[in-house]
Amino acid sequence: MEFRVIIPARFDSTRLPGKALVDIAGKPMIQHVYESAIKSGAEEVVIATDDKRIRQVAEDFGAVVCMTSSDHQSGTERIAEAAVALGFEDDEIIVCLQGDEPLIPPDAIRKLAEDLDEHDNVKVASLCTPITEVDELFNPHSTKVVLNRRNYALYFSHAPIPWGRDTFSDKENLQLNGSHYCHVGIYAYRVGFLEEYLSWDACPAEKMEALEQLRILWHGGRIHMVVAKSKCPPGVDTEEDLERVRAYF
């Protein structure tokens, strides 16, 4: 099975401006992400960006770069433009690896592509990890996902879902029971689906939560979740996240 990785990267992050180029252990963050993608065995790895600074840095460490519009509202929209520009076929599998996930294991990238290949009836495959700490469950920067019994996503939210009606009022003594999952921002799609995604209007829930994957559920698409057996390392959304990631190195 062949797959490609596209890494969407922008400079103007709201919570941590310029984060794609922040230094982590002597390398820009985007380089760590790129190197993980290369180790996954992907047929090709491309960085998609609208920023000349990111392009220059990426080309300096040997990456292929596709320049895209600055008007995109999500990584999926940026990847869709890049896939068309690069001439990818509709049935090819693309893994969207966000440029702020420097600690994603290469095996997880490949596993996601394999999962989509095994599920012809789904639009997207994505990754989640069990939540084991109460602070993470209530962290608004962490995206939670509720699954059905076959590991299809029912809903995503920044809120702590599913809500424990009888237990969440006492957070200090709260014991998690394995029912809560954190969504990791990595997706696998077929190229043909990206064109379909762009034809859909953003839905109310997507706008409220600022979560692009809710558009897929709103329009009746299915997202199959790969549940990691162990906790995946954190992505970088804030200065605090950056310090935690630096500590890993």
Swiss-Prot record:
It catalyses: 3-deoxy-alpha-D-manno-oct-2-ulosonate + CTP = CMP-3-deoxy-beta-D-manno-octulosonate + diphosphate. It holds the Pfam family CTP_transf_3. Gene3D superfamilies: Spore Coat Polysaccharide Biosynthesis Protein SpsA, Chain A (3.90.550.10). Keywords: Cytoplasm, Lipopolysaccharide biosynthesis, Nucleotidyltransferase, Transferase. GO terms for cellular component: cytosol. It is an enzyme of class 2 (transferase). It is found in: Cytoplasm. SUPFAM superfamilies: Nucleotide-diphospho-sugar transferases. The keyword Cytoplasm applies. Activates KDO (a required 8-carbon sugar) for incorporation into bacterial lipopolysaccharide in Gram-negative bacteria. Belongs to the KdsB family. PANTHER family: 3-DEOXY-MANNO-OCTULOSONATE CYTIDYLYLTRANSFERASE (PTHR42866), 3-DEOXY-MANNO-OCTULOSONATE CYTIDYLYLTRANSFERASE, MITOCHONDRIAL (PTHR42866:SF2). This is 3-deoxy-manno-octulosonate cytidylyltransferase. It comes from Coxiella burnetii (strain RSA 331 / Henzerling II). The gene is kdsB.
